[in-house]
Amino acid sequence: GYHDWQYPKEEIDKLRDPSVKAVCVINPSNPPSYELAPSVLDQLVDVVKKDNPEMMVITDDVYGTFIKGFRSLMYVLPYNTICLYSFSKYFGATGWRLAAMALPEKNIFDDKIQRLPEAEKADLHRRYSSVVLDPDKMKFIDRLVADSRLVALNHTAGLSTPQQIQMSLFAGFGQIGRASCRE
C-alpha cells in the first residue's frame, strides 16, 4: 500500500497518557525527508496542551533544511521541545557527526530540574559545583554542554580535529545573510 510517512492518529493519541514522559520525533523523516503534516503537528500540540503538558519532546530536524517552509516542533511547542540538528546532511559531511542542539530560554527541562526532590538536587549541586559558582541555577543546556565536554576531553581538546573546525565554519555560514552571500 501507499505509505504517507505520517504518524497514525491512534498512535499519537497514546501520548495523551501522562505516564509517557518523553517522545522523540524524526521530522522530516529519515531518509525520505517527508515532513509531518500540519494536522499531525496540530494533534501533537493538542496532546501536550490538553492531556500531557509535562511531556518532553525531542525533535530531530536534520532534514528540515530540505523542506520549503518547514515547521519544526520547536516552533509549535517551544516550551516542551529540545531540537537536534546536524550539519552533516545539509553540507554533505555525512559521517562526521557534526551537530547542534537548541532549547528555548524558558523550557520544561529547566523547570523539571527545579522541581526535583531535594536529594536529587543535592546530587546535581555536587556534580556541577566545579563548573559554575551557583550550580542550582545552572540551565539544562549548560549541563549538557558541561557533560559533553567531559566526553570530548576524553577524545580531544579544543578545535583540534578537522571535523571540529569544519563544524565551526558551518555554524558561521548559517549566520551569514543571503544578501552577504551575493556580494
Report residues per predicted region.
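PLP-dependent class I/II
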Residues: G1-R182
